[in-house]
């Protein structure tokens, strides 16, 4: 074994191998992850943001093959993003670039785990999609979602997805709202980066893939870029193995 690749939630410093202050892992603040792995295993360790690494794998071997500029997003428990230009991760000056999940799209919105208000993660990640569905059910709306979950408190995105495929109107409403939130967010991404392709991984991405075409059409309204509606929105090749592929890509 010549090296170990590690995908970690960010923000982090990939050059130093230090995890800085991930909102969902507060116990890892300023944690020297690469140094600890090297101390234990005696080989070089490379650490990067999980979305950066997965995006690199998709650009090299997956759904981003053939494109120069790849925007990658993991839509799941949180929302993580990565930017890959010509098979190279864009890290920014300190390594903390591409934290697109914490881009605010509603300054009066719910508070995110990062402390800001109205981040796209606070609105369209899996747990927050479920919370919006729970609010509708708590208001008394009848839905198959409640039957599948057993109670309002137990609602998860898998229940919403199943109800959607069974034709439930509340599930469709919740997911259509999510699609609109994501479209507004992606319009900003396009205006800043103008990617050649946008690749999505994670359980929420699979759930939302039925809306990709309408989201792409919506980009014509939410971006000033004249070719926004031409940019493909595609599912990642590696799915739940994106982290493994990303770790391998770091060591290539």
Regions found by a protein language model. Name each.
Residues 1-3, 12-18, 34-43, 57-67, ...:
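ATP-binding/phosphotransfer module of carbohydrate and carboxylate kinases, centering on a glycine-rich
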Residues 18-28:
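A charged helix-plus-loop insertion that forms the helical arch/lid used to bind
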Residues 48, 56:
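Generic enzyme active-site microenvironment
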Residues 50, 76, 247:
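Active-site glycine-centered loops adjacent to acidic/histidine catalytic or metal-binding residues
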Residues 71-73:
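Conserved beta-strand elements of the Class I
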Residues 80-84:
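Short beta-strand scaffold segments in enzyme catalytic cores
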Residues 96-99:
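Structural signature of FAD isoalloxazine-binding scaffolds in flavoprotein oxidoreductases
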